[in-house]
């Protein structure tokens, strides 16, 4: 039965009777707002909708905008003031105009907006504490007006199959988009900004000739950006879901996520209040679900009615309303550069971030603060902030624009990475709906990797404890210190020392370096310690310094390493990774020039196709014929037998990073026309033959894993869908887990680097196939490990560089979390160091 929402917990704002500022200084009366009337153009679809801020640390306010001062004892320069054109009258453009006009003495600022003053295509806007701190420093008057209208709340409700799970301590603030625009309109008028509504801006090239600075704040469909897309290096990505932006005439009492499981598939609702009597409601579904449900055939009125029916419980039976709302697919905008000459992109014109992580309004207003700050610095270098010489003008403006982009780009790219993770989580929502309810809620809250296990515990310890209890974690046991079983091997914890090439062998023979290196990591507490890629033949080495298992002497030395680890750190498992370099072999040691050919002493290379790794630089490999394929397969078998006799606990087949078996899998490196090339099934044939041959001689009770590159990060290469098919094939042939890496297959790849950036690929394989996965790639903290495990995205986490920085990373993680259980036992000789050493007191006592 439909239930009305529970009583609101919102703070009720007071409604100001007027905006809190008089004109700041005597100004000439600005020209009329509507200097040029034009027919309104059809509105564009909404490009973003706000969502909950995900905060991992206390907010830090940006620097205040600096107003340049006249030289001591000097007079104002008679030179003309700066002339600034702003294309687009959304919040970002308006706020930039107001901030720039506040510079002393103020530039001439003109804004063009093609729509009417009250036209807006969304409802509410969420701004974070960080953004509000920047606004307060940059313009206290705007902050004071916003503060009067904000509604605030702390909770997130996740509704999963009829159960509402609430997590508190998050902290949100929102207000209506129309109210925000009104505040900014009045602020611009008070400061003397020229506002032109229902008016198309002149072409950007024309503006650039007559103005010192042109700010393109004209949104995701920016005409300014499109006119110079090649200069800005624009990349547009349209995503898999359709969404519609609606409103309800009541206030949710929390940020609400709700899932509707229908005969057509899964749809989701994102809802939050933006006024005491109004909420934003966004309904979203994958494209195929949207079409199967017939939503693609409905107009705005029918779409609104249908969405209200789908989420009647969430709405308490109330209706929804639109505002020229239409279904659209979110588009991510990325630009290689944000400015050209004296024209700069701001807000959605420069970058977009999916509404499930943060609003474009938030990013645009932060852009405005940074741009005004750097332009103030530019003007401070000129007498009284005026510009006189045209060439000097443009040079100084260019310096300011370069500084603006340098400051903002890292923050924006970080937000876009988090937004990409979040939107992909919602695209794949159907993979998670069968999770237990609390795990599902935890997974949703940590989807972007910005909110973590430890951070969420700080916000709502009771919620995290309930999630851990549902997952049947032993009391006081972090997720990373729970055991995991692979075939006959039980790992004492979920931490893996990732394979890392050391380039320190002689003729394939490991030495004392490897004993100390791997022995130290075994003593450091990880559940599984992996060797570097161990090569199956002399010709299969990457460099002369790579280890092998192609000679009896190798077997004996590896046995010494394994026995030391087992004896010195009982419970540690040692794994060997077997591989063949393929076309990436016969190169220098990494620190001498990675992927550079040897200057002398080269050996012949083999690959599926005669394609060099770096055209014109690398050696051209020989395409393997039938005899060559059989010979390499037997080399893997012989190395596996030696690995078993050496006592390794686990064997991993290296089918990633562009080495031999990987280059069979990728269409970019496999151009064969025989049975081993063409379709994905054909490209899989040889790696599977090698896997089967190794599995046959590897002890039946010992696990085998396979490492794959889940994407080539290059057009025409392996895709995420391909990776699922590859993982499924290896699992069907007996792989006990898939080690999911990415890239390094072609030199012109474009990886999307970032914190734990490869884990979504592992997540999808695990939850789509039910196959255990090892996640790897920029996982650097124990908090990340706990978050990924408790959310059910991965089974094991492999860390490389953190274990180079700290061989005892796992034991130190246990000490920092106060864990002393069986998942991380300290070796007896080290037990005295199991507590963090005391540090000096600040008072010197």
Segments (PLM) and residue ranges:
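Conserved N-terminal glycine-rich FAD pyrophosphate-binding loop of Rossmann-like flavoproteins
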Residues: 116-134
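Flavin-dependent oxidoreductase catalytic cores
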Residues: 460-845
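Glycine-rich FAD pyrophosphate-binding loop
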Residues: 101-121
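Extreme N-terminal leader/targeting segments of oxidoreductases
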Residues: 1-9, 19-21, 34, 46-84, ...
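Conserved N-terminal helical subregion
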Residues: 75-82, 129-245, 463-465
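Conserved mid-domain beta->alpha element of the FAD-binding
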Residues: 86-99, 215-216, 326-421
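Conserved FAD/dinucleotide-binding core of flavoprotein oxidoreductases
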Residues: 163-170, 176, 191, 253-334, ...
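C-terminal helical "tail/cap" subdomain of flavin- and related membrane-associated enzymes
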Residues: 74-81, 143, 376-472
